[in-house]
Amino acid sequence: MLNSLDLEGRPQDTRVVVAMSGGVDSSTTAALLKAEGYDVVGITLQLYDHGEAIHRKGACCAGQDIHDARTVAERIGIPHYVLDYESRFRESVIDSFATSYATGETPVPCIECNRSIKFRDLLSTARELGAAVLATGHYVSSRRLPDGSRALVCAADADRDQSYFLFATTREQLDFLRFPLGDMTKPQTRELARSFGLSVADKHDSQDICFVPSGRYSDVVGRLKPNAMEPGDIVDLDGRVLGKHHGIVHFTVGQRRGLGIASHAPLYVLRLEPSTRRVVVGPRAALRMDRILLRDVNWIGDNSLDLAVGDGLEMFVRVRSTRRPQPAWLRAIDGEYQVELIAGEDGVSPGQACVFYDAPEGQARVLGGGFIKSAAPRAANKDARGAAAANRPLAAGVRG
């Protein structure tokens, strides 16, 4: 008979390691599993210690959060361990985050943290402790497939779904992971936390970029990659200089505010050129992309990636965490993988993830994904160039 974690055996005979960040989600996960009778062990990773960030609302895995996780563990009566992963986190997440921004990308550090730290190192530690599974407080689900392996599926609460950040999870990792909150809403989680008497029941949610003390990511990038703060030109699609900026790190594709340029029509950041330090801007129409070239593709669908793609695989893709999946085709071209967006997308930014799904809504299955290497517009976007010609600047400014 299978228990609530889809495992053979009684809960009391099943050890579960819970990744406890100190927030309400992971704390409720630990309390819920303990209440169901599992042998629960809590582990918190100390990922950074940046002074101001320790007490900042929305920080994660710093001093106050470690204290909160320990308090919850004592409340529910489970052993709790803190592992120092600052060095690993700095190398795998913070350094790569800064490098990505310096090369004109807009990275998603949570994906790298899950891939390199939580679902690799912590998973190994859980196995060493004799755990049957590692449970987390992510809003996502998994289900058993006919062959006994597991599929990653979206959370029941679409507004809280975190599947975008977990696309890089491997099949082996999925078999060992469990997500008890996948069928809950956030209000239900908080209510459950209150019923367990957890002090974190009303604690603020953590921020995506948890390691940025001031909330200004450019401070972190500027310290690690000073060249990203070097000034350069803001130009239109024809290369005409419209203004100056103080570092490409201050910009991302699709950005409209803070350009420091007055024009007859709104201008948007279309691309960043780190080699020339140019920020290319233009009309919204020029943001529309329909082809995306991917790197570091991870496949967790059926069969192998090459076999699944064949001459082309119809699917749905999400190019930013806040957007709904859109219809697309995945193709293998000259040894690389390319996504063709049927309706196109605005603001497709290199460094972001393009995540694959088998359906546009509901508890769709996650098929994998990759990081956006580059994007191309429809037919060179001649119409957008025409619109750009009409946007004669009224004054040039400096982006600070």
Swiss-Prot record:
<dbReference type="GO" id="GO:0103016">
    <property type="term" value="F:tRNA-uridine 2-sulfurtransferase activity"/>
</dbReference>
<dbReference type="InterPro" id="IPR023382">
    <property type="entry name" value="MnmA-like_central_sf"/>
</dbReference>
<dbReference type="Pfam" id="PF20258">
    <property type="entry name" value="tRNA_Me_trans_C"/>
</dbReference>
<comment type="function">
    <text>Catalyzes the 2-thiolation of uridine at the wobble position (U34) of tRNA, leading to the formation of s(2)U34.</text>
</comment>
<feature type="disulfide bond" description="Alternate">
    <location>
        <begin position="113"/>
        <end position="210"/>
    </location>
</feature>
<dbReference type="InterPro" id="IPR046885">
    <property type="entry name" value="MnmA-like_C"/>
</dbReference>
<feature type="binding site">
    <location>
        <position position="137"/>
    </location>
    <ligand>
        <name>ATP</name>
    </ligand>
</feature>
<dbReference type="GO" id="GO:0002143">
    <property type="term" value="P:tRNA wobble position uridine thiolation"/>
</dbReference>
<feature type="site" description="Interaction with tRNA">
    <location>
        <position position="138"/>
    </location>
</feature>
<dbReference type="InterPro" id="IPR014729">
    <property type="entry name" value="Rossmann-like_a/b/a_fold"/>
</dbReference>
<keyword id="KW-0820">tRNA-binding</keyword>
<dbReference type="Pfam" id="PF20259">
    <property type="entry name" value="tRNA_Me_trans_M"/>
</dbReference>
<feature type="active site" description="Nucleophile">
    <location>
        <position position="113"/>
    </location>
</feature>
<dbReference type="GO" id="GO:0005737">
    <property type="term" value="C:cytoplasm"/>
</dbReference>
<feature type="active site" description="Cysteine persulfide intermediate">
    <location>
        <position position="210"/>
    </location>
</feature>
<dbReference type="GO" id="GO:0005524">
    <property type="term" value="F:ATP binding"/>
</dbReference>
<feature type="binding site">
    <location>
        <position position="45"/>
    </location>
    <ligand>
        <name>ATP</name>
    </ligand>
</feature>
<keyword id="KW-0808">Transferase</keyword>
<dbReference type="GO" id="GO:0000049">
    <property type="term" value="F:tRNA binding"/>
</dbReference>
<dbReference type="InterPro" id="IPR004506">
    <property type="entry name" value="MnmA-like"/>
</dbReference>
<keyword id="KW-0819">tRNA processing</keyword>
<protein>
    <recommendedName>
        <fullName>tRNA-specific 2-thiouridylase MnmA</fullName>
        <ecNumber>2.8.1.13</ecNumber>
    </recommendedName>
</protein>
<feature type="binding site">
    <location>
        <begin position="19"/>
        <end position="26"/>
    </location>
    <ligand>
        <name>ATP</name>
    </ligand>
</feature>
<feature type="region of interest" description="Interaction with tRNA">
    <location>
        <begin position="160"/>
        <end position="162"/>
    </location>
</feature>
<feature type="site" description="Interaction with tRNA">
    <location>
        <position position="352"/>
    </location>
</feature>
<keyword id="KW-0963">Cytoplasm</keyword>
<keyword id="KW-0547">Nucleotide-binding</keyword>
<comment type="similarity">
    <text>Belongs to the MnmA/TRMU family.</text>
</comment>
<keyword id="KW-0067">ATP-binding</keyword>
<dbReference type="Pfam" id="PF03054">
    <property type="entry name" value="tRNA_Me_trans"/>
</dbReference>
<dbReference type="InterPro" id="IPR046884">
    <property type="entry name" value="MnmA-like_central"/>
</dbReference>
<keyword id="KW-0694">RNA-binding</keyword>
<keyword id="KW-1015">Disulfide bond</keyword>
